[in-house]
Design a protein with these regions (language model features):
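Oxidoreductase cofactor-interface core, primarily capturing Rossmann-like NAD(P)-dependent enzymes
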Residues: 6, 17-26, 30-39, 45-161, ...
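Amphipathic terminal alpha-helices
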Residues: 205, 210-230
Length: 230
């Protein structure tokens, strides 16, 4: 990895959602430091903090701390929940017409991951003005899962609905689907974060970086309506 980073001035770090992500971060930031990388742009996560009560946010905070401590210059990008998650996991809603949520009516200002990528690319092209900055990237509105499903219903013309489920029932459903415990624990921490209102904030940062209003869920649902068609 040290050889790979030789001569690199700006490094964009996006770690996979994997049990080893802290190990990956440790090795990567050490190598970047040793290679003399000038600026590290790190894609983190909403609410990332060493002091977070939520498991995944706390782990993201640990990685952010490594970036801050080992980088000559750094910028942190903290995106919210991705709109694309509803596309990637569209099957239950597509086949049953029902989306089950354990978020208790909590709101998220979901963001189009393509716009996160555009913002990160803009920073990486000219990182100096963003040195030491942390940007929270969200969509333009905070909405409940029921409101998101309503956007999808309007886009597809289907009778879709969101049904509440308990945190325990959600865990059991994820386990039955074959997800490992480490994934379930972290997804549960995100659901708790939403239920407790910690994901409902709307930040102006993405609009400033893009120079325009970010995509809303209604527009996104219209563009991707085929994913939820029966």
């Amino acid at each position: 990895m040290l050889r790979a980073f030789a001569g690199v001035e700006t490094l964009v770090l996006v770690f996979p959602f994997a049990p080893e992500m802290l190990e990956y971060a440790d090795r990567t930031t050490r190598a970047a430091q040793a290679a003399g990388v000038r600026h590290v742009v790190r894609s983190s996560g909403l609410g990332a903090s060493l002091a977070s009560p939520y498991l995944l946010s706390r782990e993201q905070g640990e990685i952010d701390a490594l970036v801050r401590d080992r980088s000559r210059a750094w910028t942190l990008v903290l995106p919210g929940f991705f709109m694309q998650n509803m596309v990637d996991h569209a099957e239950p809603l597509r086949s049953t017409g029902v989306y089950r949520s354990a978020r208790g009516g909590g709101r998220t200002a979901a963001v189009d991951v393509r716009e996160v990528g555009a913002a990160v690319a803009a920073i990486a092209r000219d990182p100096r003005p963003h040195t030491g900055a942390s940007y929270t990237l969200t969509g333009p509105r905070a909405e409940t899962d029921a409101e998101v499903v309503a956007h999808i219903a309007a886009a597809t013309g289907r009778a879709l609905r969101c049904e509440p489920t308990s945190a325990m029932d959600q865990r059991m459903a994820l386990a039955a689907a074959g997800l490992p415990d480490w994934v379930i624990d972290r997804l549960a921490s995100l659901d708790t974060m939403v239920r407790e209102g910690e994901a409902a904030g709307v930040s102006p940062d993405l609009a400033r970086l893009l120079g325009r209003t970010p995509t809303g869920y209604a527009e996104f649902a219209r563009e991707h309506r085929a994913a939820w068609q029966a």
